[in-house]
């Protein structure tokens, strides 16, 4: 409130990271808080309020209708946001911008074409309070690659081809950005924003080599895909300053295709490589997915007991996301009437385990201090 009064902005951007916390045990919806922020800013200022972010991107019109901003941007909105600011400043039309969501004659309008950003321009670090980032747990975020809001899918050889990535920043650009942070602000703690740092494998190795050749004394963390990995990249990441990698579980209907053991094997191999290379990792595992049984729950727990993560995040059920195959199941079982209701957190839990899975998992998690039940 004090900042808005003091700064008197003409435009305010609000990025919505998640629609909720993806917890079945303690579900929390994020949009009401975002709406409160919008209402508060509007009560203090005449600034144009623009919303965007990954969560907004799922259901742009529905989120816009609920929160009531002036404008919205769906997609990678960084560059479009800057262009919008210029157009507003010069009092020129802006409705043609890709990804724009706005209200016209009482109706919410979205042309269906999402904005895209190449992230060619570096962030304006000089406009940020960089001192705060030196105290942050993960440090400051630096973008390396962006996929399709999940792990890009490998082909039959385990390779992920370039078209699956929305953005792959040139290695020299990433290197220049982290060098500037170190030289100007003394910041060596970095989180590399990446759906899967280790894919494509050759790119990951080249980036690590660049860090080593530049003799950067970084302490960094990132996300790692639970496939397409080898001992060399783990070693290079460790040498280049990686302290921790975050791995999620491969999702999917347990009725489909591979057995659970076959699905878990690539993940088991990557965990073993990290342990042998002394690279700390966290892992996520879902329980109650489509096709879950008492036996698959037992098999997943046995797998978790066989590895040594710094932390294992255990989730009950699967978030029902717009456009996912789970939408039809959620409608059929009466969880939602239609997809527009998914602006609220909706978690699907397999009927075969639904009655007992929560209490059982609470008991199991209590036995292991490194298991965190969400």
Regions found by a protein language model. Give the residues of each.
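Radical SAM [4Fe-4S] cluster-binding motif and immediate context
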Residues: 121-281, 287, 302
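Catalytic cores of alpha/beta
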Residues: 60-67, 233, 290-306
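Acidic, low-complexity intrinsically disordered segments
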Residues: 1-179, 184-186
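Non-cysteine beta-strand/loop elements that form the S-adenosyl-L-methionine
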Residues: 13-16, 77, 234-253, 312-319
